Amino acid sequence: MKGSRPEQAVLSRDTDMSKTEDTRQVIEGMVDGLNDHRIGDIGEFFAESFKWMGNQGCGTKNGLQEFQDNWQKPFQAAFSDKVCVDESRLFMGEWAAAFGRQEATHSGDFMGIAPTGKRIEIRYMDFWKVVEGKIENNWVMVDFPHVMAQLGKDCFDGHGWEAYDSGEKQAPAPEA
């Protein structure tokens, strides 16, 4: 990269490391709450002004009510018998991150795909900011293309880069 570089890690630069254990307790309690399929009282862990920022297909939820109505309810309607398994968690001051998977049964409509009854894996990454004992912000990546593939739908219509990995297609390279 030529020229000046963008400023990095602005949001977490001044984190208060003394809050690490408090953050851990909030996140661990929240994950337990999600595994218990709590919706109505999940506000125990989230600020009312909570913002949930997901990738394309997931959307952005402004406030706890939108999160409950436009994420939790449709997600639980589409996927039953689900369990969240964080494979790794990191805690740093008011910040936490995790990646893992949810294992669930496709029991309701999802992205226009009728229920299949298949047991599937939903991979994700989460980054949380906890302030005064409540989650204020949550940046989320949910691997919906992987979910759709398990349900028989290729959202890349055969143009996913997995074709490079398998040798089906030759990967392009930038011009010198």
Task: Locate each region found by the language model.
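Short, low-complexity N-terminal intrinsically disordered segments enriched in polar/charged residues
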Residues: 2-48, 156-176
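A solvent-exposed, acidic/Ser-Thr-rich amphipathic alpha-helical stretch
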Residues: 21, 40-94, 101-103
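Short, structured motif recognition centered on aromatic/hydrophobic residues
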Residues: 24-28, 52, 72-75, 125-128, ...
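Beta-strand elements of well-folded, non-transmembrane domains
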Residues: 35, 104-106, 130
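A cross-kingdom feature marking solvent-exposed beta-strand/loop segments within repeated
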Residues: 56-58, 105-120
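Short, surface-exposed coil-to-beta transition loops
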Residues: 83-84, 121-125
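A short, structured loop/turn motif at beta-sheet edges
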Residues: 89-97, 129-136
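Short, solvent-exposed aromatic-acidic interface loops
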Residues: 139-148
